[in-house]
């Protein structure tokens, strides 16, 4: 979905007040009359977020609710074409269940990297749970391919450093990752070309991803944070590493009937009946030499469809989320950054199936002050999950 129209909104404790693209001037009047007029505008303009035409829903909301609460949020509907979605039931793909398929996947990744594949080079071991893991170590410089039960990866030294030993690695799970979403294009290729390269690679590996991706430009701001293994990199200096490691970090989201799986950790394994929640984000590094790093995510395969039902509009969820945030805002400034329609995988141990439930995921953050010998603030990231059919709060974290 491309960028559509925007709306600038103000929120009161009672309702949403919106003006489309330009502020509305209100004459000087007493507080009650002014408030009534603002509420009248809200009832009229809120229809933009409650329309039956999905394509007319704005994809970004900006507002200052009060001194402590800000909404500057992307509204992600992904491939939604109507206000109806079906739940469904799935199994998780096991990439190492078949030795032959694991070898084929390794061969694909090595061919794409320009590395020579030989069956004798593929090694295998079992993890603590007895599951097989297949891999090929090309060198001791983080050049390798791995196939695990729930995912697979291809890594080069340069890609590994960019995504796993850099400032971006420390930032990307928090709101600071937006510092790298500058839109700056690097000399070796445009953002659009690099995004397409990442999508094409995923599809060659058998993963269907959404047309919507997130791209972050890693340039001089992306410093290497770990040089403990410097002995592995002969004749390298931090300055040389910085200059040669300009790249794009691209996040891909697996597509299920037009909607991604839940992309980030909800922070509570009980919600999914799983001991650990695995993000559905595929991470890719693209640099001057092409794909430098690719890590897939758990993939769910359809077993049976559930029942199609109408889902709530974004406006309903935004109102609920703002009220929830207002109840917590006295502890620090808060920002709602994203409202996204996603599938939540809930594992049923009896059937051994995942129930893929459509949910509205609201990603938000709060400035938290830590007191001690030296006081400091940190930006804490949270997620609230709502049943897309009923609006029931499944989790606030």
Which functions belong to the PLM regions below?
Residues 3-6, 37, 388:
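Short linear motifs in intrinsically disordered/low-complexity regions
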Residues 197-283, 287-371:
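Segments that shape or occlude catalytic/ligand-binding pockets
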């Amino acid at each position: 979905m491309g960028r559509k129209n925007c709306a600038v909104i103000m929120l009161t404790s009672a309702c949403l007040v919106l003006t489309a693209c330009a502020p509305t001037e209100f004459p000087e009047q007493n507080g009650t009359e002014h408030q009534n007029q603002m509420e009248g505008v809200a009832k009229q303009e809120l229809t933009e977020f409650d329309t039956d035409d999905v394509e007319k829903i704005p994809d970004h909301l900006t507002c200052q609710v009060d001194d402590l609460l800000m909404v500057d949020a992307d509204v992600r509907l992904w491939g939604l074409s109507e206000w109806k979605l079906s739940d469904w039931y799935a199994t998780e793909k096991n990439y190492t269940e078949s030795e032959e398929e694991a070898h084929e996947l390794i061969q694909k990744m090595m061919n794409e990297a320009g590395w020579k594949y030989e069956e004798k080079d593929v090694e295998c071991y079992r993890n603590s749970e007895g599951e097989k893991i297949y891999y090929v170590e090309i060198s001791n410089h983080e050049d390798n391919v791995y196939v695990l039960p729930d995912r697979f990866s291809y890594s080069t030294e340069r890609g590994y450093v960019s995504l796993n030993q850099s400032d971006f690695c420390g930032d990307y799970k928090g709101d600071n990752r937006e510092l790298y979403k500058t839109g700056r294009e690097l000399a070796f290729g445009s953002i659009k070309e690099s995004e397409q390269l990442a999508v094409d690679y995923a599809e060659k590996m058998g993963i269907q991803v959404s047309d919507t991706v997130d791209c972050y430009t890693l340039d001089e701001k992306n410093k290497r944070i770990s040089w403990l293994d410097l002995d592995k990199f002969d004749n390298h200096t931090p300055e040389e590493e910085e200059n040669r490691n300009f790249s794009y970090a691209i996040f891909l989201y697996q597509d299920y009937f037009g909607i991604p799986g839940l992309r980030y950790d909800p922070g509570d394994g009980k919600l999914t009946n799983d001991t650990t929640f695995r993000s559905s984000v595929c991470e890719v590094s693209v640099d001057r030499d092409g794909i430098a790093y690719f890590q897939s995510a758990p993939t769910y395969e359809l077993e049976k469809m559930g029942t199609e039902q109408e889902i709530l509009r974004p406006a309903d969820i935004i109102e609920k989320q703002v009220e929830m945030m207002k109840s917590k805002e006295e502890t620090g400034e808060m920002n709602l950054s994203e409202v996204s329609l996603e599938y939540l995988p809930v594992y049923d141990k009896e059937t051994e199936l995942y129930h893929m439930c459509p949910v509205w995921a609201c990603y938000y953050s709060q400035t938290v002050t830590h007191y001690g010998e030296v006081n400091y603030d940190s930006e804490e990231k949270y997620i609230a999950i709502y049943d897309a059919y009923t609006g029931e709060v499944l989790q606030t974290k």
